[in-house]
């Protein structure tokens, strides 16, 4: 294979992986909502004075 052919194949691979990765970004919207819900639960439990999450557990008791 010549250099020009190898460069063309490289460009095709880069372009196809870029195009394929865009639709998967929109599929993560639902997962982002779940992550936001978990974070709000952590902050809510902090306001109640108890937290079982490792990030806030050292400051508050777990309450179990």
UniProtKB/Swiss-Prot annotation:
The keyword Ribosomal protein does not apply. It is found in: Secreted. The modification Cysteine amide is found at residue 62. InterPro entries: Conotoxin_a-typ, Conotoxin_a-typ_CS. Its main location: secreted. It comes from the Eukaryota. Expressed by the venom duct. GO terms for molecular function: acetylcholine receptor inhibitor activity; ion channel regulator activity; toxin activity. The modification 4-hydroxyproline is found at residue 54. Residues 22-47 form a propeptide. Pfam families: Toxin_8 (PF07365). Belongs to the conotoxin A superfamily. Alpha-conotoxins act on postsynaptic membranes, they bind to the nicotinic acetylcholine receptors (nAChR) and thus inhibit them. CnIA and CnIB block muscular nAChR alpha-1/gamma and alpha-1/delta subunits. The cysteine framework is I (CC-C-C). Alpha3/5 pattern. This is Alpha-conotoxin CnIA.
């Amino acid at each position: 294979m010549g250099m020009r052919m190898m460069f063309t194949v490289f460009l095709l691979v880069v372009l196809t992986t870029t195009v394929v990765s865009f639709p998967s970004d929109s599929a993560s919207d639902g997962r982002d909502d779940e992550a936001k819900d978990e974070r709000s639960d952590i902050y809510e439990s902090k306001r109640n004075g108890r937290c079982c999450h490792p990030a806030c557990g050292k400051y508050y008791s777990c309450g179990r």
